[in-house]
């Protein structure tokens, strides 16, 4: 997130229109209206059985994919070994085959020296599953993007220019833009993505489902779901119930119990902004209102979760980044999992359509029978993780990077915003990052450097304007 409010930008007195709004400007006034409000307008959908939900979902999903394939050029997709991009790829490749076109897939690979292939059921190298998908679809051409000799800072000046602001998502910068560039060079005009899938087509969190059942007083179903999850995943019932009880404690009580930990210092531990600025601009209060940076775990019901899914600041951030990325590389990113019809359907169905007999992401898994290979559809244990090697990529140039950070910390503008002492402490701690234990702290070291690079670009732009 680069902004906490949907209308904010980093530029003083420059604002942006919120998602799902339109503005009419006349010489007399400015009128702004919200034209899409699904939490208010979308009614609950109750069908006879799960098969009916699957049938309705597939009708909408297939059309959402199909209508995004229109282009005079090639169609590509950012594909992993997971459910979201895999489902989109399976349907898109089938449709393109009718037009005698091939779907061009682009998949991330970590550098060859990266050794942690699977950590805590997260897979860094998903090529095994991507190859399974490729062979199953038969109309999917895969280009693996390892992006050797590229790290999070290599193209950072270019990215700052594209996005017109400092880049916070450093971990993803080198492979996301790398794929966009490669696909553009290959003649791709439409690049499919499945970024929104986790909150739409493949939504389905076990503990959110349990919270929903508890709120509905369906305790018998809670017991059944716990028993099923125990059998499916092998997790002890005691551990499952312990988490359920912890989640069920009202948030206000949790705040009282953990008031010593619920401090501004802890909330902004993962930030290098000066605390006095955070206080000056009421950032803590604004974040609390939106549920950002909470040190206390809060698991809501499905209804409560849907409010956060439609957070306007988040949607604005995603939309702006995708649009500017697309404009820079001459492609159009299209996300079928963010289709308006898909979102409305997914916001209308009951919790049991998403989680069933302990199985998470049940809607997409049950809908993709015969469409996705079973190795992907029934992969309950492992999930992919992109950018797993981002710190390792920094190693060859780390000494140079540290010197650049030190230079940034000397800049007067940077000093106004950044907690210099905190960053200097992290620099001392991570003089060597070969055995890094906390990757987020390495990211905190880099953020002042990225900010400094933005400031330098801004100064150069002003100097150019004055010269003219």
Regions picked out by a protein language model, each given a short descriptive name:
Residues 67, 91-98, 182, 186, ...:
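Active-site catalytic microenvironments for nucleophilic, acid-base chemistry
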């Amino acid at each position: 997130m680069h902004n906490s409010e949907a209308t904010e930008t980093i530029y003083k007195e420059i604002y942006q229109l919120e998602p799902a709004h339109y503005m009419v400007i006349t010489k007399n006034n400015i009128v702004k209206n919200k034209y899409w409000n699904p939490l208010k307008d979308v009614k609950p959908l109750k069908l006879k059985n799960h098969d009916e939900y699957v049938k309705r979902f597939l009708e909408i999903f297939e059309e959402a994919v199909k209508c995004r394939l229109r282009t005079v050029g090639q169609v590509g997709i950012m594909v992993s070994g997971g459910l979201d991009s895999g489902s989109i790829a399976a349907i898109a490749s089938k449709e393109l085959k009718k037009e005698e076109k091939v779907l061009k897939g682009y998949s991330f690979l970590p550098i060859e020296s990266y050794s942690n292939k699977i950590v805590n059921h997260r897979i860094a190298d998903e090529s095994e599953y991507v190859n399974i998908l490729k062979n199953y679809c038969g109309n999917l051409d895969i280009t693996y993007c390892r992006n050797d000799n590229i790290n999070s800072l290599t193209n950072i000046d270019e990215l700052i220019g594209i996005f017109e602001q400092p880049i916070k998502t450093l971990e993803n910068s080198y492979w996301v833009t790398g794929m966009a560039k490669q696909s553009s060079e290959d003649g791709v005009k439409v690049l499919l993505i499945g970024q929104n899938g986790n909150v739409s087509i493949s939504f389905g969190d076990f503990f959110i489902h349990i919270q929903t059942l508890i709120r509905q007083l369906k305790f018998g179903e809670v017991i059944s779901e716990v028993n099923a999850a125990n059998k499916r995943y092998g997790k002890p019932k005691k551990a499952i119930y312990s988490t359920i009880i912890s989640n069920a404690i009202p948030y206000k009580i949790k705040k009282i119990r953990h008031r010593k930990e619920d401090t501004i210092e802890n909330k902004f531990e993962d930030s290098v902004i000066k605390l006095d600025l955070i206080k000056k601009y009421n950032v803590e209060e604004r974040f609390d209102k939106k549920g950002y940076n909470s040190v206390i775990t809060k698991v809501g019901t499905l209804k409560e979760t849907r409010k956060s899914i439609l957070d306007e600041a988040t949607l604005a951030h995603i939309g702006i980044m995708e649009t500017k990325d697309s404009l820079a590389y001459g492609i159009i990113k299209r996300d079928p999992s963010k289709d308006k019809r898909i979102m409305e359907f997914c916001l209308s169905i009951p919790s049991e359509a998403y989680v069933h007999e302990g199985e998470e992401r049940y809607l997409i898994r049950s809908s993709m029978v015969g469409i996705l290979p079973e190795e992907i559809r029934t992969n309950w244990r492992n999930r992919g993780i992109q950018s797993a090697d981002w710190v390792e990529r920094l190693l060859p140039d780390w000494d140079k990077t540290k010197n650049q950070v030190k230079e940034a910390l000397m800049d007067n503008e940077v000093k106004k915003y950044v907690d210099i002492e905190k960053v200097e402490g992290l620099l001392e701690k991570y003089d060597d990052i070969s055995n890094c234990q906390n990757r987020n702290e390495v990211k905190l070291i880099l953020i002042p450097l990225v900010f400094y690079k933005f400031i330098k670009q801004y100064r150069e732009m002003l100097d150019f304007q004055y010269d003219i």
